[in-house]
Amino acid sequence: MNYKQPLIVKSQQQALSALRNLKMQTQDTHLNQFFSDDSGRFERFSVEQEQLVLDFSKHRIDQNVLNGLVDLAHAQDLTQWIQRLFSLEEINYTEQRAAMHWALRVPEQNQQVLPEITAQVHTQLERMYSLVEKIHAGQYRGATGEVIQDVVNIGVGGSDLGPLMVTHALSDFKVVTAKPLDVHFVSTMDGSQLSDLLHQLRPETTLFIISSKSFGTIDTLSNAQTVRQWLEKALGKNSHVLKHHFIGVSTKPDKMSEWGIAPENQLLLWDWVGGRYSLWSCIGLPIALTVGVDGFKQLLSGAYAIDQHFQTAPFAQNIPVLIGLLGVWNNNFLDIQTHAVLPYDGRLKYFAAYLQQLEMESNGKSTQRSGEKVDSATCPIVWGEVGPNAQHAFYQLLHQGTHKVSCDFIAPVKRYNANHFTYAENAEALIEQHHLALSNCLAQSRLLAFGNQALTADEIEDLPTYKQYEGNQPSSTILLKELNPYSLGMLIATYEHKVFVQSVLWNINPFDQWGVEKGKEIANQLLPILNREQDDLSTFDASTQGLLKILLGKNNG
């Protein structure tokens, strides 16, 4: 890439004006034309960083657009904002907190970066590692003396989505334990997951992790209370049972103690860790239980590698910055306000759901840091599914619908090796299946970009309109050399920093979530009525009153 930071940085308005002009110049240019105009386009618009490769050549940009986007990043002081992120500054200004999730992956031996905080982090991680090794060795026993063989993580949001996603993604790296060990996840407040799960478990051999930053989330505590009653019914109601069957992860040791969790079973967080950024902390206990201590450390190392890349690489070769800038171009200049995440590997089944929270809870904001309303669109709708399944669900809309959609295609270069084969005779067939997934990944991104031009001349001849493809849907392709703990750490941290880049360009705070809070308060007003502890419906709107009457069996219909 040929971009060099200008000697004179443009103002924000100059950078935006230049990009608007470039939009007018390029908006009618099809991706087919971009590629025919530049035979070196892939080399120009792709970046490799250790185990990650980003191909962004199928975006509707040319070199001038990329230069203009980098100018905008400089005009918005992105360099300074990155420095502010990697500091003690309270950039989460609405909650008066720093945003220091990156500190969770600083290596213990690095004494140059906030040594006191690094020491605190590693004290808790070492406590978690000791617990993991004890469970793996079959030395952690329940109240009756039997070895723990099932661990249930009870959490919601960041205490569930991240650990669930990573645990599933790294299923090939599950460690061998002294006795079989299974990890389960429960999040829904309606009890349906618990109802299904408890029938499969034995109280004597089950350990529960109550994972809640505030230790006040009703979803989590209601599930925790249900399993407590289940345990106490089988094993007796005493502190001995609680001590052997519950681990707590929270910023609130006093609340954990009040609930009954023994101090030695409490793993601590800090207010400067946002829930959706917390899988690197002891919230990641289910991950460590699955992949082992070494696997968890590799996950942290991969994220740390991207932290360093994000802080040091020029913007035009900086993967998180590039992904963020391309999203802004699509969203704010090309008016593409929906983004699909399409991993071509079943192990990344929960990755799109994880990114929905990471991106939409972070950047789904309409108020600037100045307190004024934003004057442009912020976070697009993020959605997705494992690619091969999605091809049979919603790709019809991507190819021939009326909505403009940008996509991220994600795939590992290598899938299977000798360690992954249960039976040697499966090897050839499984590798062929991986190649089938890769061929579909490349084919779909090609067809979305080039439309009819991706077809042969024979196919196009006399092709009815309902079989034609317009193309021109932009996409990135992200290749992992292999899906392993290190590369997954890199991938997740890349998206974390993408979110931050976009928040800077939109001038919003990505680390709070006030839109979530009020609904919980209103639910607390409704619960006493549904529990028949109150009966005054007059303060509610007509719709809510009507629905409450049906739920209470008071309707006259």
Curated annotation (Swiss-Prot):
Organism (species): Acinetobacter venetianus (strain ATCC 31012 / DSM 23050 / BCRC 14357 / CCUG 45561 / CIP 110063 / KCTC 2702 / LMG 19082 / RAG-1)
Top EC group: isomerase
Reaction(s) this enzyme catalyzes, per UniProt: alpha-D-glucose 6-phosphate = beta-D-fructose 6-phosphate
EC number(s) per entry: 5.3.1.9
Pfam family, one: PGI
Cellular localization per UniProt: Cytoplasm
Residue positions of the active site: E361 (proton donor), H392, K520
UniProt superkingdom: Bacteria
Protein name: Glucose-6-phosphate isomerase
Gene Ontology biological process terms in this record: gluconeogenesis; glucose 6-phosphate metabolic process; glycolytic process
Isomerase recorded as keyword: yes
Main localisation: cytoplasm
Listed NCBIfam families: PRK00179.1
Classification via PROSITE patterns: P_GLUCOSE_ISOMERASE_1, P_GLUCOSE_ISOMERASE_2, P_GLUCOSE_ISOMERASE_3
Gene3D superfamilies for this protein: 1.10.1390.10, Glucose-6-phosphate isomerase like protein, domain 1
